[in-house]
Amino acid sequence: MPQIGLVSAVNLRVQGNSAYLWSSRSSLGTDSQDGCSQRNSLCFGGSDSMSHRLKIRNPHSITRRLAKDFRPLKVVCIDYPRPELDNTVNYLEAAFLSSSFRSSPRPTKPLEIVIAGAGLGGLSTAKYLADAGHKPILLEARDVLGGKVAAWKDDDGDWYETGLHIFFGAYPNMQNLFGELGINDRLQWKEHSMIFAMPNKPGEFSRFDFPEALPAPLNGILAILKNNEMLTWPEKVKFAIGLLPAMLGGQSYVEAQDGISVKDWMRKQGVPDRVTDEVFIAMSKALNFINPDELSMQCILIALNRFLQEKHGSKMAFLDGNPPERLCMPIVEHIESKGGQVRLNSRIKKIELNEDGSVKCFILNDGSTIEGDAFVFATPVDIFKLLLPEDWKEIPYFQKLEKLVGVPVINVHIWFDRKLKNTSDNLLFSRSPLLSVYADMSVTCKEYYDPNKSMLELVFAPAEEWVSRSDSEIIDATMKELAKLFPDEISADQSKAKILKYHVVKTPRSVYKTVPGCEPCRLLQRSPVEGFYLAGDYTKQKYLASMEGAVLSGKLCAQAIVQDYELLVGRSQRKLAETSVV
């Protein structure tokens, strides 16, 4: 992962002007005769600015020469090969679940399943039901796919997104989904490092580099031990001792930590507060948009468990373009190719019940009704709670939802009039009190690539006190924080880099707020109401409130429906018989 715009072989504190390069890590030094590498190249379709080809005979000699002349690259855009994920236990487990839908007996009467919400949970549910031979009808309230990964195109043709979405190696169901759709090449894998800004040293960063040659957890342990800028050796030792119970206790220990906050758990384990301040404020905000005094320790341990036990678990990839087109549309096309339907602008007004309390139909805003053999709600938990029928509110299963509340988050996009130098081809942890993670999307993402101007996408969190404020106030506050990250290039008054335009996307209720005591409130996908199911990252599954959790929840929801096939067919037949008698 290049830091401050440089490949790791170069002195990271030296900055200067030079050309931008974009290549594949696996193809360096293997250029074809026309100047483009045979596997990946500088030339990307769909952008005039990507049509120029550079012949790079030896990139490593270039970096050595630049270091000597103090004219290093601003950033070397390098996409790394897809890591070897396919033989990991979690990937194979996810692959087996996927294959169970394709190999299940074809239904004599395919079920029509009405699904509310075309986020990743709803799309996943529909995709795997279609694989099992059923006919999903997926309804999306808005005119855009994706839910929490939605994005929009402005009048200039530029995209702005709901969030800054990172695809980890520790996302086995998501990685399987990309493979099943044949779009693995749409993930741009970055160098296996985590880069943290140094608040006390404006403009400087500290790295955790995971060595490729070592297996997990040794690669992660060495990455921590080699970093001497954020933690002292005594702090590392105390932190390691504090983590021992989690490493030895396994999943049962992790689940038992749901009731304690990150900050309280660290103190209980004798871990210095400075470790929490230096590392876990940034990690907590990245995982759930809140600080460690609020976040459940279970959330952190789930992430650490994946990152430390899987060699490529913490390796990160960016999608090569906007999520609705590059990820969601392939899922929709797959669903429709198997006879399913996806309908936009289909907002649900009411869940209409039968006399026995089961679902009769969904009533849409336009007054139309949608009936089916089964019904799924795959919306965010707050939307489902708003539409929860009165007759269901006394059912203990649904009463558990009361504690689950979405956390507010803001995603900020700023287009600058110049290319920023103090950036990197990867995700960056700002360690700012107002900002969480950020990236220069003009570098990390092919569709957003711009050789002349930077576009920073930043997660503004915690956002509870800011979500009701004006966009201009949020931008002003963001610029003050960016002035610390880019002291030579950005000032709050724009006397340096100037803003060309910006977009602020507010999500008042995003993923559920993972405070202590929430785990028992996460519901199984099969509800006690016959024929009604739930999907979404807030439902019961072993991953965080994340894209991976949403995809897995959809698979588990589809699995429950397939398992209930005979029951649902019998229910439909009874309903048909009752209608005939009337």
Curated annotation (Swiss-Prot):
It is a peripheral membrane protein. It is an enzyme of class 1 (oxidoreductase). The keyword Transcription does not apply. Belongs to the carotenoid/retinoid oxidoreductase family. Substrate binds at residues 306, 545. This is 15-cis-phytoene desaturase, chloroplastic/chromoplastic. The keyword Oxidoreductase applies. GO terms for biological process: carotene biosynthetic process; carotenoid biosynthetic process; response to herbicide. PANTHER family: 15-CIS-PHYTOENE DESATURASE, CHLOROPLASTIC_CHROMOPLASTIC, PROTOPORPHYRINOGEN OXIDASE.
